[in-house]
From Swiss-Prot:
This is Sugar fermentation stimulation protein homolog. The gene is sfsA. It comes from the Bacteria. CDD domains: SfsA-like_bacterial (cd22359). HAMAP family: SfsA (MF_00095).
Amino acid sequence: MSEPLIFYPQGCCRAIFIRRYKRFTVEAMLDGEVVGVHTNNTGSMLGLLREGQEIYISPAQNPNRKLKWTLEAVMPFGEMIGVNTSVPNKMLQLAFEAGQLPEAGGYTAIKREAKVGNSRLDGLFTDDSGKLPKLWVECKNVTLVEDDIACFPDAQTERGRKHLVELMDLAAKGDRVALFFFVQRTDGSCFGPADFIDPEYAELFYKALDAGVKCWAYEAVLSERGIGIGRKLPLAACR
């Protein structure tokens, strides 16, 4: 098993999911008390939030925050599924620095939240020699598996479609570009766009591949200690 590159903070624990009642808040039962738990996942988390199931939560690192817990993972089938959407961005950098991202071989530095035009992309790789073209990467968290295929998105995503257009524009200018899909569950055998949820995104995704955008879909290795990076998933043959 891959060693974690991201470690959960001390004090993490399991709780029982009750409901999601706001976009960024879920209720859980912890030690007989109902507590509010922050979630940064704005997706639907389709099929993952079931009353009575176990979830994995971490204590807020800011003692002044109103919600004292953060949702890290859910366990609808007993196995951990990571739902914290800040993880892929962190993993991109840490996997690169650990030499576990072969697609970025030859590059020597990464800048996160790199500005491009009026927008920002999650990662910009450069090399000291200047011989390699810029490599722009946008990260996405994947929590949905359907018919053995890890799928993105789990809800309509105008922002995701915008990122695809931006990446295609950069590819047309001669830069290298990629999408890093971090699949925070282990029951998918391949990756593909969720055309049954956002057909426009799926259409743009394949156009992006034709335009030179690369797809890096990696499976997470999850434990209650933290998160590592596992195998690379092939693209589903369902185009």
